[in-house]
Amino acid sequence: WNRGDKSEYEFVGRRLASMGYITAVPNYRLYPEVQYPDFLEDGAQSIAHLKKELQKPEYKNLNPAQQYVLMGHSAGAYNAAMLALDPRWLNAAGLEHQTSVQGLIGLAGAYNIYPIKDTDVQPVFNHPDYPPKSQPIDYAGSRNVPALLLAPQSDTLVSIERNTKALHQALQSAGNQSKVESIEGTDHITLIGTLSPLLFFKGSTTKPIDQFMRELHQKNNLSAANPEQG
């Protein structure tokens, strides 16, 4: 929420595209320019813009889906989870939440972070006066969005127990489909790095992501571009 730019994650878009999936990697405004919930509104507007763009004739041959899988890492996984589970943000952007989101992929996500100990993150959520109902875990029972939650083998920045495992358990308790996978040999940073050719020697996130996406494709008839050859 206070650092990062989409240009740093071009490798993620390229990797997912090579797997056959139309992929967009958007920016969102950062603290101190904004606080919660402005970055969620940015994310919802990005999805609305993407939907409009994909309706243009030049994308027709890609057969783009009208339903989206939201994916993010760390703070980005928080954003993706909130947009997937809390209908307010997409509805406010003019989208039908129920039919717009078909899946969630979170990597080392921050889903249940109160009370916040990181002094860099505290002002983003107006510590100690946290806004109510502002964590993904609060919406675990709001609707059935299949979730794949990927965790590193070890994480000193975001507690796996308090976040990934807690959200997984909350989703399952609410009757929702959720799967957790721990990626061997990774930490908080290298987990997303496994999508880069430079870290292919690490445990792979591509296999569980691809399997999850293909299961959604079969279930919901999601459209994907043909995988690149080679």
Segments (PLM) and residue ranges:
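Primarily recognizes the serine-hydrolase "nucleophile elbow" in alpha/beta-hydrolase
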Residues: Q45-T119
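Short beta-to-alpha linker loops that shape the active-site pocket of alpha/beta-hydrolase fold enzymes
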Residues: I22, N27-Y31, A110, T186
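Acidic beta-to-alpha connecting loop that harbors the catalytic carboxylate
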Residues: Q153-T156, G185-D187
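Conserved alpha/beta-hydrolase "acid-adjacent" motif
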Residues: T156-K165
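Short amphipathic alpha-helix adjacent to the substrate-entry channel of hydrolases
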Residues: D5-V25
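C-terminal catalytic histidine-bearing segment of alpha/beta-hydrolase fold enzymes
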Residues: H168, Q172-G230
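Short beta-strand/loop motif that positions the catalytic acidic residue
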Residues: R143, L149-D155
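Mobile cap/lid helix-loop segments that gate and shape the active-site cleft of serine hydrolases
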Residues: Q102, G106-Y139, V145
